[in-house]
Regions:
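Gly/Ala-rich beta-loop-alpha elbow adjacent to hydrolase catalytic centers
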Residues: 1-4, 8
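Alpha/beta-hydrolase-fold catalytic nucleophile elbow
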Residues: 24-25, 73, 111
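C-terminal catalytic histidine-bearing segment of alpha/beta-hydrolase fold enzymes
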Residues: 44-45, 91-133
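Mobile cap/lid helix-loop segments that gate and shape the active-site cleft of serine hydrolases
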Residues: 18-62, 67, 82, 86-90, ...
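Active-site signature of alpha/beta-hydrolase-fold catalytic machinery across serine-
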Residues: 10-14
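Residue-level signal for short, function-critical loop segments
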Residues: 2, 76, 112
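Short beta-strand/loop motif that positions the catalytic acidic residue
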Residues: 65, 72-74
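Acidic catalytic loop of the alpha/beta-hydrolase fold
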Residues: 76-87, 115-116
Length: 133
């Protein structure tokens, strides 16, 4: 969730021991988009990985390891993960999961709302882990 969500995303990317991730309001989307259009002071140093964009954006890394299961809970008005950045992420990552033959391994919930944790988010996360672990 939140800071833990982005931490779980980056750990999911780099550590093969992490079989699946489900960041809730975790700041996943596009670092490039957020840097250009978002409120940069919203995220602390934990979010800005030095030099990351010289290698790729969050979607590039997720697409590269498809079909490793990933679920995002991305409220459409979450200041920490603008909808436009999430949309860019989905547009790049979804085809990678389809090409890998496991489109069900990538699940995105873009519910109306702000940065908050709801029972619906937890229920979606539990169902995702039950199915993928």
């Amino acid at each position: 969730m939140s800071f833990g969500g982005i931490t779980s995303f980056y750990m999911w990317v780099i550590d093969d021991r992490i079989a699946a991730a489900a960041p809730l309001c975790g700041g996943v989307g596009s670092v490039d988009y957020f840097g250009r259009k978002g409120r940069m002071s919203y995220h602390g140093t934990y979010w800005w990985v030095p030099g990351m964009l010289t290698k790729g954006d969050q979607a590039d890394f997720a697409a590269a390891i498809a079909p490793k299961p990933l679920m995002l809970w991305a409220p459409t008005e979450d200041i920490g993960m603008p909808k436009e950045g999430v949309d860019q992420f989905v547009a790049k990552v979804r085809p990678a999961y389809q090409q890998a033959g496991k489109p069900s391994g990538f699940v995105v919930h873009q519910q109306p709302g702000k940065h908050s944790f709801t029972m619906a988010a937890f229920e979606a996360m539990f169902a995702f882990f039950d199915k993928n672990l």
